[in-house]
Amino acid sequence: MVGLISTSETLPKQESKSSSAPVSNFLSPNNLTEQTCSPLRAHSTFKEPVFLLSQRQYSHNSKILTELINSVKRPNKPDQNEEKSAVGIEEKSFKDEHLAQKKGLHHFADLKEIFLNKNLSTLDGLQDASLHDNIQSGKLDNPVISQNRRIVLEKLANPNSSKEYETIPTVENRHPLNKLSKTKTLAYEETINQLDETPGGTNYPMNKKKTLSSETNKYEYPQQSKFHECSQFASPRSSIVNGPRTLGKNSKRADDTARMASRMKPSNFNNNIQSSSYGHASQSTKLTSQRDNDHQKDLNFSPYKSIPLNNRPYSPMSEIVGFSGSTTPLDTYGNRPSGKKFNKNSKFRPPGSTISSYSSASTLRRLPRAPGSKVHAERQNSTFNSGISLRALRKEMGNTAPVSSNQLLKDADLVMENLSTRNTEKVLREVNILKRLRESCVAITAKSYDTLDERKIRSLTTFEYLEIKNFQKIYFTGSENCQKLSKQIPLDECNEALFDDDNGDYKAIQGDHLLYRYEIIDTVGKGSFGQVLKCIDHKRGQVVAIKVIKNRQKFHGQTLVEVGILKRLCEADPADKNNVIRYLSHFDFRGHLCIVTELLGSNLFDVIRENNYKGLPLIVVKSFALQGLQALRLLQGQNIIHCDLKPENLLLSHPLKARIKLIDFGSSCFYNEKVYTYLQSRFYRAPEIILGLEYGKEIDIWSFGCILAELFTGVPLFPGGNETEQLGYIMEVLGPPPMALIRNSTRSKAYFDSEGKPHPITDSHNRLLVPSTRTFSQLLNTKQASFLDFLSKCLKWDPKDRITVDSALQHEFILGKTSQKPMVSKGSHPLPDLPV
């Protein structure tokens, strides 16, 4: 069916005959004869040029059609010059062509030729085209306004007719189309029938179409133009005559609006499918602002807002057309749950809630983390490409080369820097303190007791006065205002034990000295071995960390082993490229063995805690995994087992970067010099330790896998309250251990019966821990295949089946198969670097 705006009696017949160019497959101009058009000419008084609309192109020219409808004028006065009117129309068409070219509508020239040369008029098609234009643009007018416009145009075309129109339908009727009364003129009906019998018409034998139904439940979506930039196939569920149908189950996932797609030029199409917060903000800011304005207009003007739609909330995405290859769920703007009430078990996922492994650091501040709802391997939800898998994304990117370790570390540093902006005040305070410390560090020339200043000698206590004579080199004797502990010790009761507390730890006082060389600044941490102090080395003029071991005989032997291991590792890695803490020196002071090392930052458990136990982005976890494996490779190259891998023993070497170093070799041993049979922290304890089996370097691989899982989720993978519960959590995922391990276990009777079946185990909440009832994918709440495969190879019952360090470094999870650099949003700002 063809919709007309106006006709002209003054156009020469040559122009009418010259318009024999094909309009579309829907209507052939050869079928439009003078006899066909004569009924309408008899009733036409317009002196404007003819505008013929092709409904096969209405979705491609919807905005132009709306502008033409709004620009229709009343009949010119009798004395008005026809040439001026024609010139005005020609100028208007030139502006429309310029607007069409700007919007990328490449078929406007053919449409304009049809507009200027055809000589038909019918208003029924005009109403359909006008309605579809409004649906496509998301700005469906008020039915009253549409009806009034129809009446005005009908009056303009037939000023002498006396048509009567039906009552204007209200919004409650939910009838988006207006109907003409049954009192249509005979000429009008005859013209409609003749047009419908043309090829493509509703009454054409090859494609009969249903008549317009008054039941809105049978409405269907208008068919999208095949010329649309984002369209490839016309929807078979569409019908121009029947109009849009109501939203049902089949429309819960549908294509994006042609209104939104028409504003996106093909040159920017790839940029627009990416999330604006991830992509180049400078290129998408204007488009995003325009999209937000149109969305607000849709909420204000759409008639579906007041219509009950089978428990489906209104969304501007309800007016949708396109091909089924790109679908998106209905965006429930009004009923979207808040972040605090988000249910991780719900199937609902708000748009933009998933990120890829190489995700933008700027979005990490607003996305949920595992074990809540984070999905690391899926592509960012977009209105055009939500259904594309990661495999298709990688193929589309065309980059399957492994990611270099340097690139991985740089990308993780960028993400870690943006994570640090959450605690900007704390990080800046730490950076400033460390900066002042380093600026105050000045190397001092050593002096003997005979060359000391009188002022320093007067500051010595009675105990120090006798003690200092045993030191040949003196660098620091304590700050002036320091309340030294030695002042409280009488000379006749001098004993090294008086400097210790009840646990054997040294009583460190800020401003006091160690070995008349190191100035105590602060206490960094404490443990079963003793404590770690932040100090200034006045000999080297640098800030160091000193591990002060407890004054207990049982710790002395292992401390000497630790010193030997640190020395060996530093000699094997002189360039400091394998992420192991740097050993500087060691000494014995007042009954305490002290190990001097470089000063590092927070441990990874503190990082998880500062992130509210929500876990870290996968790219950061991958970076930590790479660095940890490099450290383990160095250890195994020197036949060393760490024996106590846990997040607390992995420290950041820089507060703003994802760089870590392995520390605490107090439980470490060489392969042939195993000291303990019961070691490792419980959450990271290998099964062979629990079962009392022989152990080797493989226990570090088990602990390493547990650490990566905890970094990703924010909570321990196997949080057993005791060894029995710990074994129950492991069997929940891995099932019972092999019979070979049970038979060789020295503690098998505590956990298994004579047939190797595990005894019933309950956790602290009296929940029965049933073997083989959970998976890594469930515990980690992710489907990242390479990460899950990596963990499954680290966590095996039999140590011989676990992945080796060399194989782990070549695993797909470490190497990666895609490299998409994370981008920092314009709103974020980098924190200052630490002073050198």
Swiss-Prot record:
Catalytic reaction equation(s): L-seryl-[protein] + ATP = O-phospho-L-seryl-[protein] + ADP + H(+); L-threonyl-[protein] + ATP = O-phospho-L-threonyl-[protein] + ADP + H(+)
Residues where ATP binds: 524-532, 547
Biased composition (Polar residues): 192-205, 232-241, 265-288
Name listed for the protein in its UniProt record: Serine/threonine-protein kinase ppk5
Gene: ppk5
Record-linked SMART domains: S_TKc (SM00220)
UniProt function note: Has a role in meiosis.
Keywords: ATP-binding, Cytoplasm, Kinase, Meiosis, Nucleotide-binding, Phosphoprotein, Serine/threonine-protein kinase, Transferase
Organism: Schizosaccharomyces pombe (strain 972 / ATCC 24843) (Fission yeast)
Biased composition (Basic and acidic residues): 289-298
The family this protein is said to belong to: Belongs to the protein kinase superfamily. CMGC Ser/Thr protein kinase family. MNB/DYRK subfamily.
